[in-house]
Swiss-Prot record:
Annotated positions of the Phosphoserine modification: 112, 125, 147
Protein's name according to its UniProt entry: TBC1 domain family member 22A
Region annotation (Disordered) ranges: 83-147
Residue ranges constituting the Rab-GAP TBC domain according to the UniProt record: 202-426
Length: 497
């Protein structure tokens, strides 16, 4: 059976709009949501924001790649980075747990970090077993590697906060990063490990479509083989359409198609989804995937995973200031056909790694929510205890985080930036996503601890004020998730007390 997605809401919660709702429902007989919450949210959004500043802290993180590391070195450096970052912004350091907090924007421009290529950092367990000669060699292959976050000032579509870097320095840096991507992608054989390293801190918009196709495993690293692969896979997809799609009205499949048909108009952004051509494309993609994956079939939540791929691939052919306002009316039919096929295959590659999230009873999600609960109890016991005291269960808010990969918690532009990193990480959509969710929850520790009853806590957790988030917020969230991963990676009992 299909499990409910708790409190699903599109678009992500906007505290300015929600203020009206709170006032209109203030006379409910149940415990009211206090009006003070509105002003708190407004003040919270106007006075604070997250940013990963380019400065000396970047040098410390980059230096982590220069040598084989053990867990003590990793944790000491990462903690120092976050502590120094907090002190520069005048933000108090938490006594309980390493949770993320909002901080004021810097008043002065921080220095730009030096450019340079990064080396892979081995996992904690490998750092203990590596020989000195191997760790000192640039050419030494790594059996299990993970990407180090680069300087996170470069953001979605090559844009950033004007207050972080001067426009000239920013343009020069963007151009340099774009050039590195283009050189890697030009081949003749793209170095996928180097591409993952470079992509961790965000992919420039012009090269994002090809980079995603490579990182997802849809296209080969060899440049000469790519056109033939694209042609073959696109032809294969439309053979599925011809063979299966007419069966959508058969008795055995009509319930699946009906549910897809109902769910698509509920998706976000509405300006994109409600275009008839897009609706038809999404219906075909989801129906064909469900028919070809009978172990899970179609489950609510899978539909959301189509959108980022489709938007990224369509933006290769049209100019859109905001990804939420993409208009496909001027895109040739043949181009739309190719984008549809590419979207199907890339979404399929993603779901191959998390399919147990969507099989009967969704055991993958049940397990990950439990793991999140154990992890949060380790990293911030005060937040965990506060939720428990007010009888808020993780399943009531985190089920959606796992089911939709945080797509309903942050704007689409932030989801795309998040997926840049997920596709750069080993098991990014499953394993690393767990640490991102932990960092995301603890990020709101101050607001969580201020709420004193079940209703207000759950309302807040299901409607987090992220409508105005940008890539800086995602970059800091990813940096904290990366630190948590290093702290707990390869520890056999790291989810248990």
């Amino acid at each position: 059976s299909i499990q409910h997605v708790y409190g699903a809401q599109h678009p992500p919660f906007d505290p300015l709009l929600h203020g009206t709702l709170l006032k209109s429902t203030a006379k409910m007989p149940t415990t009211p949501v206090k009006a003070k919450r509105v002003s708190t949210f407004q003040e919270f959004e106007s006075n604070t924001s997250d940013a990963w500043d380019a400065g000396e802290d970047d040098d410390e993180l980059l230096a982590m790649a220069a040598e084989s590391l053990n867990s003590e070195v990793v944790m000491e450096t990462a903690n120092r980075v976050l502590r120094n970052h907090s002190q520069r912004q005048g933000r108090p350091t938490l006594q309980e747990g390493p949770g993320l907090q909002q901080k004021p924007r810097p008043e002065a421009e921080p220095p730009s970090p030096p450019s340079g290529d990064l080396r892979l950092v081995k996992s904690v367990s490998e750092s203990h077993t590596s020989c000195p000669a191997e760790s000192a060699s640039d050419a030494a292959p790594l059996q299990r590697s993970q990407s180090l976050p680069h300087a996170a000032a470069v953001t979605l579509g090559g844009t950033s906060d004007p207050g972080t870097l001067s426009s000239s320095a920013l343009s020069e840096r963007e151009a340099s990063r774009l050039d590195k991507f283009e050189q890697l992608l030009a081949g003749p054989n793209t170095d996928l490990e180097e591409l993952r390293k470079l992509s961790w801190s965000g992919i420039p918009k012009p090269v994002r479509p090809m980079t995603w196709k490579l990182l997802s495993g849809y296209l080969p690293a060899n440049v000469d083989r790519r056109p033939a692969t694209l042609q073959r896979k696109q032809k294969e997809y439309f053979a599925f359409i011809e063979h299966y799609y007419d069966s959508r009205n058969d008795e055995v499949h009509q319930d699946t198609y009906r549910q897809i048909h109902i769910d698509i108009p509920r998706m976000s952004p509405e300006a994109l989804i409600l275009q008839p051509k897009v609706t038809e494309i999404f219906e075909r993609i989801l129906f064909i995937w469900a028919i070809r994956h009978p172990a899970s079939g179609y489950v609510q939540g899978i539909n959301d995973l189509v959108t980022p791929f489709f938007v990224v691939f369509i933006c290769e052919y049209i100019e859109a200031e905001e990804v939420d306002t993409v208009d496909v009316s001027g895109v040739p039919a043949e181009v739309l056909r190719n984008i549809e096929a590419d979207t199907y295959w890339c979404m399929s590659k993603l779901l191959d790694g998390i399919q147990d999230n969507y099989t009967f009873a969704q055991p993958g999600i049940q397990m990950k929510v439990k793991m999140l609960e154990e992890l949060v109890s380790r990293i911030d016991e005060q937040v965990h205890r506060h939720l428990d005291q007010h009888e808020v269960r993780y399943l009531q808010f985190a089920f959606r985080w796992m089911n939709n990969l945080l797509m309903r918690e942050v704007p689409l532009r932030c989801t795309i930036r998040l997926w840049d990193t997920y596709q750069s990480e080993p098991e990014g959509f499953s394993h690393f996503h767990l640490y991102v969710c932990a960092a995301f929850l603890v990020r709101w520790r101050k607001e969580i601890l201020e709420e004193k009853d079940f209703q207000e806590l759950l309302l807040f957790l299901q409607n987090l004020p992220t409508a105005h988030w940008d890539d800086e917020d995602i970059s800091l969230l990813l940096a904290e998730a990366y630190r948590l991963k290093f702290a707990f990676a390869d520890a056999p009992n790291h989810y248990k007390k």
